From Swiss-Prot:
This is Ubiquinol-cytochrome c reductase complex assembly factor 4. The chain crosses the membrane at residues 79-95. The gene is UQCC4. It is found in: Mitochondrion inner membrane. Coiled coil: none annotated. Keywords: Electron transport, Membrane, Mitochondrion, Mitochondrion inner membrane, Respiratory chain, Signal, Transmembrane, Transmembrane helix, Transport. Forms a complex, named COMB/coordinator of mitochondrial CYTB biogenesis, composed of UQCC1, UQCC2, UQCC4, UQCC5 and UQCC6; stabilizes nascent cytochrome b/MT-CYB and promotes its membrane insertion. Forms a complex, named COMA, composed of UQCC1, UQCC2 and UQCC4; activates MT-CYB translation. Forms a complex, named COMC, composed of UQCC1, UQCC2; UQCC3 and UQCC4; mediates MT-CYB hemylation and association with the first nuclear-encoded complex III subunit UQCRQ. Complexes COMA and COMB are bound to the mitochondrion inner membrane by UQCC4. Residues 29-72, 110-132 are annotated as: Disordered. GO terms for biological process: mitochondrial respiratory chain complex III assembly.
Amino acid sequence: MNRVLCAPAAGAVRALRLIGWASRSLHPLPGSRDRAHPAAEEEDDPDRPIEFSSSKANPHRWSVGHTMGKGHQRPWWKVLPLSCFLVALIIWCYLREESEADQWLRQVWGEVPEPSDRSEEPETPAAYRART
């Protein structure tokens, strides 16, 4: 043949190309591979980008056990100093006495100290009932 296709054959070739193009989507289904390009052809082309969906870094395939190992635990000498520091900081914040900086911040923010018992204020209805 002269490499010239007749009209029906050319239409069939175009249809096959269209089917191949349509089967390759931007977001392939998990676990499916692009059958139009064999794996050997993908490895031969170094300029082609790596497909995340088919890589081992895909979240459907990756887990923490792959990175750290299944029985991995942080050593106590890395965890203990940080834990002790955070506990000491929280205790210090709770137990420290009020300083001048705290008073200054109250003035800046406009906070008014709350009275210990609201029923003794003259504006509350409970205070009016107690007087009558």
